[in-house]
From Swiss-Prot:
Coiled-coil region: none
Major localization class: cytoplasm
Pfam entry (one): CLP_protease
Active-site residue list: 111, 136
Gene Ontology terms describing biological process: protein quality control for misfolded or incompletely synthesized proteins
Species this protein is from: Pectobacterium atrosepticum (strain SCRI 1043 / ATCC BAA-672) (Erwinia carotovora subsp. atroseptica)
EC number, UniProt record: 3.4.21.92
Protein name: ATP-dependent Clp protease proteolytic subunit
Function: Cleaves peptides in various proteins in a process that requires ATP hydrolysis. Has a chymotrypsin-like activity. Plays a major role in the degradation of misfolded proteins.
Known catalytic reactions: Hydrolysis of proteins to small peptides in the presence of ATP and magnesium. alpha-casein is the usual test substrate. In the absence of ATP, only oligopeptides shorter than five residues are hydrolyzed (such as succinyl-Leu-Tyr-|-NHMec, and Leu-Tyr-Leu-|-Tyr-Trp, in which cleavage of the -Tyr-|-Leu- and -Tyr-|-Trp bonds also occurs)
Top-tier EC class: hydrolase
Subcellular localization, as worded in the UniProt entry: Cytoplasm
Amino acid sequence: MSYSGEQERQAPHMALVPMVVEQTARGERSYDIYSRLLKERIIFLTGQVEDYMANLVVAQMLFLEAENPEKDIYLYINSPGGVITAGMSIYDTMQFIKPDVSTICMGQACSMGAFLLTAGAKGKRICLPNSRVMIHQPLGGFQGQATDIEIHAKEILKVKAKMNELMAKHTGQPLEAIERDTERDRFLSASEAVEYGLVDSVFTNRG
C-alpha cells in the first residue's frame, strides 16, 4: 500500500496508539483510544495546527453535532499553534455548530492554540493547573516581487486586526489591550489566563 506524504508522517505515531477492547452483546469490539474517547464526545487538538489535523477536528465536531446537537463537546488542546487558515476553519466550526464546545488546555495553548482555547463556550473554558497559554500577533514571511510582498503585508495586517477583534470579544478585554499585549509573545500561567479572560477556571481535579 502506498502512503501520501501526510499519511506517511502520521503512520509511526499511529502504531503507538493504544487499543481499547470492549465486551458487547455481539462479542468483543476494539477501538483505538481516540475513537473510544470520541464516543464520550472528547476531541484532541494536539501538535501543530495544520490543514490535515484541522480537517479531522472539524469532521469530528460535525459528526458529534449530528449524533446529538444538545450535548456538549469537549476539545482538549495541547498545541504550540500553527497555520491561521487551518485554525480559523476550526474556530468557525466551533461557532457554527449547535452544541457548546468546552475547551480544556493541557500542557500548552500557544498562538492559534490560545485563540481556539478562548473561543470555547463562555463558562466552559478551562486550564489544567500547570498548563501555560501564549498569545501574540500573527507571523508571516513572504518572498517575491515588491508588489506581491506589499499585497501579503496588507493581508496579514487585516488578519491581525480581525483576530484582535475576536480575541477582545471572547476575553472581554478592550481592543487596545489586546493590540498591546499581542505585540510580542506574552506567556500566561493558568491563573493568569483566568484573570485575563482567556479561560473561565482552573481545574485541578474532576471533583
